[in-house]
Amino acid sequence: MTLPGRARAVDPSEAELAVVIVNYNAGDYLRRCLASLEARRGDISVDVLVIDNASRDGSHEAAVAAHPAVRLLANPDNRGLSAAWNQGIRATTSPYVLFLNPDAELWRGTLAEYVQVAREHPSAGIVGPLVRNPDGTVYPSGRVLPGLRDAVGHAFLGGFAPGNRFTQRYHMDGWDRTTEREVDWVSGASMLLPRKVFDAVGVFDESFFLYAEELDMATRLRGAGWRVLFTPRVEVIHEIGVSTGRSRRMLVMHSTSVYRYYRKHRAPGWRRLTLPLAWSALRLRAELEWVRERARRR
């Protein structure tokens, strides 16, 4: 439902940019996310829409109360990220749509500059910013699609030996991310898409409940001739894991979504010959990550 009585800074039908934030028990991070958008809007009209997937912590109500220009759609159940993103697409009309995690904050640059980058690169179906961890280090958003060898190597070694050559290739570690360049995909924590791409390839695949939905969209867009662009002109800080958690269930869900992606996009021969190996590697990685997470909490 749409909560009535919210003051709006701009008519949503006239906004140049729509920002879609899917919330699920994000606590005070959502309020901070919204505050960063207000502080770094720039000279652009913005329609901010929070879609809540049945949070129990009241974060959506408290955050929107503090930011009355924000619209709220409150779902009675958790519909998953892709389905909620699609709700946001249907509920907005702006020519550009920014999908932003509730545990992410715009840190450098403005929303206006984000859109300007997209306008300067009309062939870009996705624009992603430089993403930083809370300690200021650079998170490797903007990656290549790994081949089977690198995917399995990263799955086995990435959590314990991040300097291994498989992970280095996957993360494009030889690039310092100070330059704008085309990549295979960017993190869904923050990505801007021109609305016209949804007419070209459709909306997000709702069979991806959580994880790999941005990877799937990037692959579909690149297959249709669009580019995926990384830009350092905008920076986002992302508190990874607040929106999703690091439970064993979430780690297994991540592996399941990645498996679903490879099953969907790889050729029949690849599926027939190597998919069981990839699935085993992904599940083993989930178990190893869970062991590491439990050890970290002690």
List PLM regions with ranges.
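Glycine-rich, basic loop-to-helix element that forms the pyrophosphate-binding segment
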Residues: 74-92, 102, 113
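Non-catalytic, C-terminal membrane-associated alpha-helical segments of glycosyltransferases
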Residues: 246-298
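Short, flexible, basic/aromatic active-site loop/helix in glycosyltransferases
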Residues: 146-183
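A conserved acidic beta->alpha catalytic loop
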Residues: 36, 52-60, 77
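Short aromatic/hydrophobic "clamp" motif used to bind/position activated sugar donors
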Residues: 97
